[in-house]
């Protein structure tokens, strides 16, 4: 019987393996695998000694020497910041999650639809009942259908393609931008109603969306970032939003955000997180790095590992 050690300890419940997730893993992996869950780093390193597979959020390069039988190192995350994948010895397969593209695509689609239907309009900002200030007339020329609009998805890997497929299902024309056609981005941006960033932080894309690229966008354009915060010049984006240079933005990731996924800025808050939320432009929607939240998150991860031959 082969052994898989599961060390998925994380503050957010959907990212933490508890009894229901472990039961799902046993069902998905089948009887040929023995499942061992660890809660502490020391317990994980002990269990790693005779494990063929490890499912983790983070893995240090020195740990490979403690895992002579390891054949698969898997992490649910798509980002590569927490796993020493470059140091994996020959014979060890490193697997990064791609399943959450479908979840993140729903988050992007939710913003797109809510924006088009006027859900974020300032006319609706009051929490009071409408009363005499019934905003129906004011809202009547602010809504539109998304079918026939144009989206540019930058970062067209598994996550980006899932986002593109979801938007295409809504009737949106999608152009994907990857390393192969990165030079096309300025031209494509000029016709974008939706500019979606789904980039990891290790691809040399720091401040890809800067004042120059923003100036290429139509005034009707909205920016979405569900990749990593390093891809945006936040000062330039805030200025464009405040001036009405672009129509809106949805940011799920930021420069210097708290927690283990903070970028190389040393944890220093970027321009968006440094501003009190009430002072942010009203056409900016911010979320706490939650575009992949789903109660089924880890079960989807385990199914992907099974389908990809890791279990």
Predicted regions and their residues:
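N-terminal glycine-/charge-rich "phosphate-binding" loop or analogous flexible N-terminal tail
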Residues: 1-51
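Short acidic low-complexity segments
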Residues: 38-47, 61-64, 177-192
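Phosphate/diphosphate ligand-binding glycine-rich loop within oxidoreductases
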Residues: 49-129
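Short glycine-/small-residue-rich Rossmann-like dinucleotide-binding loops
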Residues: 59, 78, 198-201, 227-228, ...
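Rossmann-fold NAD(P) dinucleotide-binding segment
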Residues: 59-68, 85, 204-223
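Rossmann-like dinucleotide/phosphate-binding beta-alpha-beta segment
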Residues: 138-219
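Rossmann-like dinucleotide-binding domain for NAD(H)/NADP(H)
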Residues: 220, 228-311
